[in-house]
Each structure stands twice: as structure tokens, then as C-alpha cells.
Amino acid sequence: MASLKDLRDRIASVKATQKITKAMQMVAAARLHRAQEAAQSARPYAKRMADILTSVAADVDGVDAPALMRGTGRDDVHLLVVCTAERGLCGAFNVQIARRAREQIKALLAAGKIVKIITVGKKGADILSRDYKSLMIDHIDLHAVKRIGFAEALVISQRIVDLFNEGAFDVCTLFYSEFVSVINQRPTAFGLIPMGAPKAAVEATDVVEQKETSKDSQSIVHEAIVYEYEPDAASLLEALVPRNLSVQIFRALLENVAGEMGAKMTAMDNASRNAGEMINKLTVAYNRQRQAQITTELIEIIAGAEAL
């Protein structure tokens, strides 16, 4: 049985830990607000960027589309870009992303594909290096970055483009955590390269005007809006494709930051609650032992007085 001094020391230690977890929870809550706003602001921009790309691609023949959009026509070599946090103390946030990537790696290897991995964030690199260190070809360190910006997305996208131009891979997939709510972050796999065939994009993004041509038949004629591009659509698409790649990566990074802060706030809140419960249990144990000690001392005093 622990002595009273040991119990006092443990209570003091847990209280000190609780102060730290509460402070970390408050910091995460403040950062979450900014990160959530940034992620939500990036979503419509990234979606509109993809819509514009698809619309322009509809006016370009498949053979004239940029290589990043067409791909190599093969799927033998897969590049997986796994984005996690630089630090821990955020529950299962990093583990869930790594688990999603592991599932993909196992499926690709079982299908006889070649897998290459680029990690963004220290925690993902630590987890994946345990089993797939030989597959990891690069690591992008963001430890010194205080606030994720578009410059970090450009670094990642440029590295991917360089590898693609070198013929290092056929298909590229980005793994990150989509921010749903403070308590819900969804591990997501997003295909970066190839971006999709223009022919498939036409049906999804045709803009039509509906005009009534006959009051009797109420028939509707759909007329597609035709755009003119300066310079030509192919040149515009060539410039938009790498930009879209950077934008989608930037959106994923912002989603990751928001998810990390949400997971960290939840984890620190749980830690603070657990510390409070532990303090209560230790305090009860301390009071019981102290009461028993006082009772024993009183009995000894009474017994000694009776002996006299």
C-alpha cells in the first residue's frame, strides 16, 4: 500500500499534468478556429479550380491534353504521397491516415505493382518506415513551418512533377485527413495523376441553357455555351494543370491541419477528464488512509491511557 507521502506526490504530479493538458486544449481550440476557416475557404476555390480545368479540357482533344492529365497510359508504378502531422498528442489522427495508406500499399503489392512513397510529416514517416522503409523515396519536412501556406504545397507539387517528368511513376495518390467535424476526421485517398481524361469530363461539366420553343409541345432545347480562349485552350490547359495540382495539395494540407487541431483538442480534453478522475480516486484513497492512520493513533493513545 502506498504511503501518504507517495499519494500526495502522485496527486500533485497528476494535477501538474492536468494543467498542461488543459493549456494544450486551449491552444488547440484557438488554432482549430483559424485552421477550420482556412480549410473551409479553400474548398470552394479548389472545387472551382477543378471545374474550370474540366471545362477547358472539354475543348481539347485527348492527344493534346497535358501529360499530367493524360498520364502515361500505364499503372505499373504507383507513387503514394502520405500527409500526416509533424507532432503527436492528437489521438489516432496520424495512425488512421497511415492505416489507410497501408491498406493501399498492401493491395498494390498484392496486385504486383511497384510502390513508391513520399511522406509529408514526421509521424507518418515514423509509422510507415517500420514496414515499408525500402519503398520510401523522399520525405518532406514541415517541422519548422509555423503556418502552412501555398509555398509548402508548391514544394510538394514540384517534387511530384519532377518525378513524373523523370518517368519515376505512372499513378500518384495523395493521402490526407478530410476535416468533417471536431470529433470526426476522415482518412482520404485522392488521385492526383492522372487528373482524368477530358472526354470523361465533358458530360459532367456541360453548361446548358434551356429555352422553350413551343407552347403546345413544351419541348426543351439544350444549347451548350461555347467559350473562346486566348491563348488557345490547349495552352491554357497546359498552364492550369500544374496550378490545379498545387491547389489540390494545398487544400489537403489545410484539411490536415484542421483535422490535427480537432483531434488534438479532443485528445487533450479526454486527457484532462481522465486526470480529473484519477485525482478524485487518489484523493479518496489518501483520505481513507489518513483516516485509518488517525483512528489507529487514537486507539493507541486510548489504550495507553487505560494502561496507566
From Swiss-Prot:
It is found in: Cell inner membrane. GO terms for cellular component: plasma membrane; proton-transporting ATP synthase complex. It is a peripheral membrane protein. InterPro entries: ATP_synth_F1_ATPase_gsu (IPR035968), ATP_synth_F1_gsu (IPR000131), ATP_synth_F1_gsu_CS (IPR023632). One of its GO terms (molecular function) is ATP binding. Its main location: membrane. Signal peptide: none annotated. GO terms for biological process: proton motive force-driven plasma membrane ATP synthesis. Pfam families: ATP-synt. It comes from the Bacteria. Keywords: ATP synthesis, Cell inner membrane, Cell membrane, CF(1), Hydrogen ion transport, Ion transport, Membrane, Transport. Belongs to the ATPase gamma chain family. F-type ATPases have 2 components, CF(1) - the catalytic core - and CF(0) - the membrane proton channel. CF(1) has five subunits: alpha(3), beta(3), gamma(1), delta(1), epsilon(1). CF(0) has three main subunits: a, b and c. Produces ATP from ADP in the presence of a proton gradient across the membrane. The gamma chain is believed to be important in regulating ATPase activity and the flow of protons through the CF(0) complex. This is ATP synthase gamma chain. It comes from Bartonella tribocorum (strain CIP 105476 / IBS 506). The gene is atpG.
